[in-house]
């Protein structure tokens, strides 16, 4: 249904033409700063068989994906220390590394014990040391944990590498035979598991703030209806059954309310449901389409997409009353709003001019400037990491729907590994630890 509404908005936008941008706003298309060089040395392994996952590779990829760090390739490393006493700082200074991480993995009673240490190369001082244990199957979990600890120590920002991702795949076997699958994976696309399969479309999956429930739109009754599902048990509950469109669910920050879009009274508008009483209240009204709600962290403000001004733009409104305030002014299409954790940045799907080139962009909410983050052309469904450092979005490559990751500073752009078929509708989890 989100794609249907987006299509409606695109048509309206094309008919409306291109409006002039507010002169006080600025469009930025690229940056010039560089990521900090870091060396994550392959961890020593004192066991017999080969481990299924390379911890150093996973940690390096995590730090790279943040856009803050540039890992030094293994083939460029002069030495391969596995413990603090083996670190020769002149080797890493010669390579231009500002930080170096070493570690070792030791089998212990059927489990693995991992020791790691992080050093500042310039000062030759230890920045972080620690240990973590787990099973062989938890190698990726332990790697993401070390990434989280290291990133927070170096930047002061909580790491988001132990989070999860929801997305939908569509695998078409024939004209009337498509299988839709709701998947959950690590944030980087690894270890995907199936939560739901259907012969009808699944749209707009969203994690609840507790990370234990999800809401999504299913067409299994041949019309869009919103369901809530418990991840651990698979128990599902249908929560809407209104005439017309039922879609775009969005959890409130405390998980007690759910915003969504209904067209039961005419045009699509945003409503809020109290999850305890199941009572609903209307947030938007008037002509035009109002869709894609996203909550501010105060639990009272909702950002949303509306074409009330003649073309799709982002607005915000208080659920307790009052008019809507326009937020975006650059470009003739701005939709799918998401806020960074500090609420200083608005991430959205943006089109500067013309009728193509839908790209992920970030707007500084204090200055009004907009920075285009991607170089793809048909972007949609952007979702932001809970620490605001990374964005995952859906786009098309070689005629196929894929997921891409881009750092919020624009330094890193890369595809995520996913299953066969069309991949769409990504949604990032909250912190899970």
UniProtKB/Swiss-Prot annotation:
One of its GO terms (biological process) is protein import. Keywords: Cell cycle, Cell division, Periplasm, Signal. Its main location: periplasm. GO terms for cellular component: periplasmic space. Pfam families: PD40 (PF07676), TolB_N (PF04052). Residues 1-21 form the signal peptide. It is found in: Periplasm. Part of the Tol-Pal system, which plays a role in outer membrane invagination during cell division and is important for maintaining outer membrane integrity. The Tol-Pal system is composed of five core proteins: the inner membrane proteins TolA, TolQ and TolR, the periplasmic protein TolB and the outer membrane protein Pal. They form a network linking the inner and outer membranes and the peptidoglycan layer. Belongs to the TolB family. PANTHER family: PROTEIN TOLB (PTHR36842:SF1), PROTEIN TOLB HOMOLOG (PTHR36842). HAMAP family: TolB. This is Tol-Pal system protein TolB. It comes from Pseudomonas fluorescens (strain ATCC BAA-477 / NRRL B-23932 / Pf-5).
């Amino acid at each position: 249904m989100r794609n249907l509404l987006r299509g409606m908005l695109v048509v309206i936008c094309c008919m409306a033409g291109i409006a002039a941008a507010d002169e006080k706003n600025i469009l930025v298309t690229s940056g010039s700063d560089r990521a900090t060089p870091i060396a994550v040395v392959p961890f020593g392994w004192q066991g017999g068989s080969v481990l299924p996952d390379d911890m150093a590779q996973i940690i390096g990829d995590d730090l790279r994906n943040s856009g803050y760090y540039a890992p030094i390739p293994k083939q460029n490393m002069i030495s391969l220390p596995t413990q603090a006493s083996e670190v020769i700082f002149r080797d890493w200074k010669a390579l231009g590394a500002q930080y170096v991480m070493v570690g070792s993995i030791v089998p212990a009673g059927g489990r693995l014990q991992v020791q790691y240490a992080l050093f500042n190369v310039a000062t030759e001082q230890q920045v972080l040391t620690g240990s973590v244990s787990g099973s062989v199957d938890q190698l990726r979990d332990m790697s993401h944990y070390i990434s989280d600890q290291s990133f927070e120590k170096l930047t002061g920002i909580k790491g988001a590498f132990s989070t999860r991702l929801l997305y939908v795949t569509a695998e078409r076997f024939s004209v009337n035979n498509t299988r839709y699958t709701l998947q959950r994976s690590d944030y980087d696309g690894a270890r995907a598991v199936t939560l739901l399969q259907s012969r009808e479309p699944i749209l707009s999956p969203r994690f609840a703030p507790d990370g234990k429930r999800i809401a999504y739109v299913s067409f299994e009754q041949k019309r869009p209806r919103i369901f809530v599902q418990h991840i651990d048990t698979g128990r599902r509950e249908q929560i809407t059954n209104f005439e017309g469109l039922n879609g775009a669910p969005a959890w409130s920050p405390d998980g007690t309310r759910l915003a969504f879009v209904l067209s039961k009274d005419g045009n699509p508008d945003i409503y809020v449901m109290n999850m305890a009483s199941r009572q609903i209240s209307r947030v938007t009204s008037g002509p035009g389409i109002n869709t894609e709600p996203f909550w501010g962290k105060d639990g009272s403000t909702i950002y949303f997409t509306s074409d009330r001004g003649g073309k799709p733009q982002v607005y915000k409104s208080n659920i307790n009353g009052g008019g809507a305030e326009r937020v975006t002014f650059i470009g003739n299409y701005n939709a799918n709003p998401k806020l960074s954790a500090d609420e200083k940045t608005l991430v959205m799907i943006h089109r500067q001019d013309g009728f193509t080139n839908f790209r992920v962009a970030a707007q500084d909410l204090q200055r009004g400037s907009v920075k285009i983050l991607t170089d793809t052309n048909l972007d949609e469904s952007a979702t932001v990491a809970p620490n605001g450092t990374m964005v995952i979005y859906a786009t098309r490559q070689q005629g196929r729907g894929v997921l891409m990751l881009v750092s919020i500073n624009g330094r890193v752009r890369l595809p995520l590994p996913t299953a066969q078929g069309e991949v769409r509708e990504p949604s990032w989890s909250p912190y899970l630890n």
